[in-house]
Amino acid sequence: EAQWLIRTVENLLSITRIGSDRTELNKQLEPVEEVLAEAVQKARKRLPEIKFSVEVPAELLMVPMDPILIEQVLSNLIENAVIHGKTTTAIHLRAEKTEDNFAAFSVRDNGQGISPALLPHLFDYSIRHASPPTGDGKRNMGLGLSVCSAVVKAHGGRLTAHNHPDGAEFIFCLPMPPADPAISTDLSEEETL
């Protein structure tokens, strides 16, 4: 009960912060492996019955982000997979660099998937309403995915969701800094010496 209340307050504070005109993200270059590991570590404590797996690139992937907010996005997506996936027993998190210079984060579950009728409006809080209480008596405020969308957009990224044969997958992409040709040239010259 206390953890649910804390997460609800965190979501409300984040959406208020992101919605204000003077929002400044605390962006810094962060290794995606550490952000994913932190989110999974916290999720394992709350959801010991779920099997988690993580896949990251072999090379270090540094992404400009507000790590606290991105960890909240990951936590919300994990919790969403468990609550709405209903039959979810495993969640796979993955990060990779895309060809168009984005860092793509994926949260994939083996639950029941997303109703096709909900997919077009999944991130729109004005369309979604609080759901009836779940089996444990808690209400879903409908904030989690709206917060995810707002945080990712504030980072200049995009968030999508789709079903796959064994459940649902949420993918969000954050822009990477442009590669500095001088740095890569210097490194290649040092390697040849």
Report residues per predicted region:
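Short helix-loop "hinge" at the ATP-lid/N-box region of the Bergerat-fold HATPase_c
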Residues: 81-82
